[in-house]
Amino acid sequence: MKKSNDCLKSKLLLYAHYYSPDVASTGQILQDLAEGMKDVFDITVICTVPSYSGIVADKYKQKKYYYENINDVNVVRIRVPEFTKSNKLSRIKNIISYFFGAINVTKKLGKFDYVYTISQPPILGGLLGVTGKRITKGKLIYNIQDFNPEQVM
């Protein structure tokens, strides 16, 4: 009996605050990355519901989590509060909601061989990756983008 290729694939968990169809550059880059690796890895992306503009569509306001498959990539979307780009408190609430929602989803998904995260949002991206690594027992891949130490001040 011949084994399916999917049985041989390593599992990769990818954290992305934004993912397709959001137009944020990080979401587009991570979509290209995920779709480019889907033949080698069984990929699951944990991201927010489409909300780059700050507005959440009505179809994403009913449930806490949404499960989709986009071009053979498993996507788990987390409902987050709407925000205004000029209101820092609303942005912080959005980021914190994603962070804790992503941790809860990660606990439900089980083990992964690799956990991939980026430095967006700053600090929490790395913290989410380390937490995800501990939960899934996977190896952490941390992609640092746009590193600007002066942002801390």
Region locations from a protein language model:
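A conserved catalytic-core segment of Leloir-type glycosyltransferases
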Residues: 7, 48-106
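Short, glycine/serine-rich, charged loops/turns that create anion-binding
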Residues: 19-20, 50, 82, 122, ...
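Short glycine-/acidic-enriched loop or helix-start segments at secondary-structure transitions
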Residues: 24-25, 55-56, 87, 126-128, ...
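An aromatic- and histidine-rich active-site surface loop
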Residues: 91, 95-103, 114-138, 142-145, ...
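N-terminal subdomain of nucleotide-sugar transferases
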Residues: 1-71
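Hydrophobic residues in well-ordered beta-strands that form the structural core
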Residues: 14, 45, 77, 142-144
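Structural motif
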Residues: 11, 113-114
